[in-house]
Amino acid sequence: MAEYGAHITTASVADDQPSIFEVVAQDSLMTAVRPALQHVVKVLAESNPAHYGFLWRWFDEIFTLLDFLLQQHYLSRTSASFSEHFYGLKRIVAGSSPHLQRPASAGLPKEHLWKSAMFLVLLPYLKVKLEKLASSLREEDEYSIHPPSSRWKRFYRAFLAAYPFVNMAWEGWFLTQQLRYILGKAEHHSPLLKLAGVRLARLTAQDMQAIKQRLVEASAMQEPVRSVGEKIKSALKKAVGGVALSLSTGLSVGVFFLQFLDWWYSSENQEAIKSLTALPTPPPPVHLDYNSDSPLLPKMKTVCPLCRKTRVNDTVLATSGYVFCYRCVFNYVRSHQACPITGYPTEVQHLIKLYSPEN
């Protein structure tokens, strides 16, 4: 087995095909960036809901737009996505002979560029939305938010039953392709690369030199602009390029920070972290009647602040500590993504059901 593994490693190194470690590392790069940015946006939204709340509500769409600008910038200038270029890889058209391959600095052909952009940006966006839909429907089904006569009841229950198997088949498809790639039976580690009609290869020294040369020429060259339309087009092109370059620089710095955080919070370092960051337990608050004079709060503590009736299925918001009826606060949070009393950004997962001794 060791000899066969060494043979595979030697063959992959001799060829321009990257190793499984390189392709898996570049795949995990953007996967780590998304939750990191999401956490930053969440902190901003909680600190100032009026100014940054929209970033949290529309995070998926904003991230997808910025991701598209970033990936399109790299695909058209380096023939690679951001993470692939970061690890010194490029995309080449599958099945093309070596002497007919385009240089990496020329970018991908339009057909392969748009296919690559769709699988890099649009597909992850749809997958995230599908996961959120499944989570929301599962929550509604668990607490019977929909009335029994709802015509969508059969549909969403069938969706919830089928989704785990579809997701398992999807992940199994990718795992099978990676195993075939390790064994040298496939030239694509991901089925999406095959669907896009490209494969990954290592950047050569000539590719790196050509990419640097193109960047220098692009910054030094000033094209004469005649008509107003050309001026607008040139300005938009420069703006998009500037945004993509800023994102690229920021992500390149952030990647090292993310790797440090990953090391810091790894299981091997937990004992050392606990000894370094251990602090004494803070004293309890003097009282818990904060903002008790608010007109939104009822005088009786057993009354729901939303429906003004005796609470049913007591549920507390983890973001503010106020208690409501489950049905009332679920519908409010789902519509407004905020606490009804404080306005703090809130999601459905922040609802915590309470079970009193009387029940």
Swiss-Prot record:
As for membrane topology, the entry says: Multi-pass membrane protein
Q: Which pathway does UniProt place it in? A: Protein modification; protein ubiquitination
Question: InterPro entries, alphabetically?
Answer: PEX12, Pex_N, Znf_RING/FYVE/PHD
Listed GO CC annotations = peroxisomal membrane; peroxisome
* Compartments where located: Peroxisome membrane
Asked if the record carries the keyword Zinc, the reply is yes
Q: Start and end residues of each RING-type zinc finger?
A: 304-343
Question: Please, which domain of life does this record's source organism belong to?
Answer: Eukaryota
State which residue ranges cross the membrane. 20-47, 52-76, 110-139, 145-183, 250-277
Q: List the disulfide bonds.
A: none
The protein's UniProt keywords, in alphabetical order, are:
Membrane, Metal-binding, Peroxisome, Protein transport, Transmembrane, Transmembrane helix, Transport, Ubl conjugation pathway, Zinc, Zinc-finger
What SUPFAM superfamilies does the record point to? RING/U-box
Major location, coarse class?
membrane
Pfam families in alphabetical order: Pex2_Pex12
Q: Tell me which parts of the chain lie in the Cytoplasmic compartment.
A: 48-51, 140-144, 278-359
GO terms (BP aspect):
cellular response to reactive oxygen species; protein import into peroxisome matrix, receptor recycling; protein polyubiquitination
PANTHER family from the UniProt entry: PEROXISOME ASSEMBLY PROTEIN 12, PEROXISOME ASSEMBLY PROTEIN 12 PEROXIN-12
Q: Which family does it belong to?
A: Belongs to the pex2/pex10/pex12 family.
Q: What is known of its domains?
A: The three subunits of the retrotranslocation channel (PEX2, PEX10 and PEX12) coassemble in the membrane into a channel with an open 10 Angstrom pore. The RING-type zinc-fingers that catalyze PEX5 receptor ubiquitination are positioned above the pore on the cytosolic side of the complex.
Complex and partners: Component of the PEX2-PEX10-PEX12 retrotranslocation channel, composed of PEX2, PEX10 and PEX12. Interacts with PEX19 via its cytoplasmic domain.
- Protein name (record): Peroxisome assembly protein 12
Organism, by scientific name, is: Mus musculus (Mouse)
Protein's gene: Pex12
